Amino acid sequence: MKNMTLAHITEVCGGTYFGPEEKKTAEVTDIVTDSRKAGEGSLFVAIPGERVDGHKFIPNVASQGALAVISEQTLETPPCPYILVKDSMEAIKAMAEYYMPVSYTHLRA
């Protein structure tokens, strides 16, 4: 299993990190989009949806021990470190591609 620190994730997602410098080297234990599943060491990805905007759950995940969040919005008073990105879904895709690179060399066209 690859170690993914907040610094790695910030780079992979092309985002901007906001938070204490010492937290950048902390390793993420899991990545979640469901705020109810966030816990100690989690990275919560806030996704704006048609009915519910995941950004409204950021205070909840911070109180549950989440290490950080990925947000499309600038947080005025962040309850925990966060990575600002242009598109949360693209950030998830970038993290997945980094974590589990796919090789298509075995396919014939």
Residue map of PLM features:
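Short, basic phosphate-binding NTP loop
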Residues: 2-108
